[in-house]
From Swiss-Prot:
UniProt keyword terms in alphabetical order: Ribonucleoprotein, Ribosomal protein
Biological processes per GO annotation: translation
Coiled coil (residue ranges): none
Gene Ontology annotations for the cellular component aspect, listed alphabetically: ribonucleoprotein complex; ribosome
Keyword Ribonucleoprotein: yes
Pfam families (UniProt xref): Ribosomal_L31 (PF01197)
Subunit structure: Part of the 50S ribosomal subunit.
Gene giving rise to this polypeptide: rpmE2
Record-level Gene Ontology MF annotations: structural constituent of ribosome
Protein's organism: Neisseria meningitidis serogroup C (strain 053442)
Family under the similarity heading: Belongs to the bacterial ribosomal protein bL31 family. Type B subfamily.
Protein name from the UniProt record: Large ribosomal subunit protein bL31B
Gene3D superfamilies for the chain: Ribosomal protein L31
C-alpha cells in the first residue's frame, strides 16, 4: 500500500443508530465533532450518530406501512363519482 494516501483523521469510528439502539465500528474519516462513546469492549471511540440505518429503516426491517393500495383509476373514480352521477342524471 502506498504511504500517506489516507487522510490524517482515518480512524476507527463508532456509528450508532439511537432509534434501533445498535452500533457498528468501522474505519472512517467521518467528522464526529468531538463526541465519543464507550463501546462494549470498554474503550472510548469517536461517535457518529445516525438517525436511520438498516437496523431502523422500514424497508430493511419489514415494518413499513402501506399508505396507499389503490390505483390511480380508482382514485379518480372516487374523486369524481358525484360529478359523474349528477351529469348522468341531467340527461
Amino acid at each position: 500500500m502506498k504511504p500517506n494516501i489516507h487522510p490524517d483523521n482515518y480512524r476507527t469510528v463508532l456509528f450508532f443508530d439511537s432509534s434501533a439502539n445498535e452500533g457498528w465500528m468501522i474505519r472512517s474519516c467521518a467528522e464526529t465533532h468531538g463526541k465519543t462513546m464507550v463501546w462494549t469492549d470498554g474503550k472510548e471511540y469517536p461517535l457518529f450518530s445516525l438517525d436511520t440505518s438498516s437496523a431502523s429503516h422500514p424497508v430493511y426491517t419489514g415494518k413499513q406501512r402501506n399508505v396507499n393500495t389503490e390505483g390511480r383509476a380508482s382514485k379518480f373514480n372516487q374523486r369524481f363519482q358525484s360529478v359523474m352521477s349528477s351529469f348522468r342524471k341531467d340527461k
